Amino acid sequence: MNLQKIAMGLGLSIALVACSKDEETIVVPVSAITVKDLAADTVTGLGLDGRPQSALTTTYYSLVDNKAIASTDAASTKWDIAFSSTKILINGGTSGPGIGGAFVHIGSFDSFTSIPADSIFKTDNANAASYAIPLGSGKAWYTYDGLTTLVSPIAGRVLVIRTATGKYAKIEIISYYKGGVTLPSTASVNDKLFKQRYYTFRYAYQPNGSKTF
């Protein structure tokens, strides 16, 4: 009888441990969040050289809390990414005190469900004009057409982000213009000028520290 009780107890313990291990490996998919019309150093007018003028501001954003962060907290780890015109910064390297990093994945947002183990996260290095999310037309998330003066997100480009505190997120830029629209080449000069630098994007943030979405 005692042996039976011991055996039953051991069996129950093993079953509980097995269940516990199974529960630890369960990954709950995260839902995508859409951010609309996030202003990013919006245009105030044209300079004498015909170039757009602005206040040269930067908009800081927390992917953890899904909200803009005050510029007075730029030297903190409260923000994860920042926007200024077409430039996107991460909280790491020369851009901030965090351990953030990023790389650009070529593929669809929905099908990118896990970060490969051999992925290399780059950091910002403003001194060398090198950024985790590269600057320039065709290099990361957008193209610029000099004839139409329009900025267009590139389909199938996913920004993979390591946040300021070491968690992970993925981002897809949907629109660069107010209202989340794609401006036609025939849009007015005023629309092209003053509706730009308003980001609409969607992102998925994994709060548990894993690299699976």
Predicted segments, located by residue:
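Bacterial N-terminal signal peptides that target proteins for export
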Residues: M1-A7
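Surface-exposed, beta-sheet-biased, low-hydrophobicity segments with strongly acidic/polar composition
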Residues: S20-F213
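C-terminal motif of bacterial Sec signal peptides marking the signal peptidase cleavage site
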Residues: A15-A18
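Hydrophobic alpha-helical targeting segments used for export or membrane insertion
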Residues: M8-L12
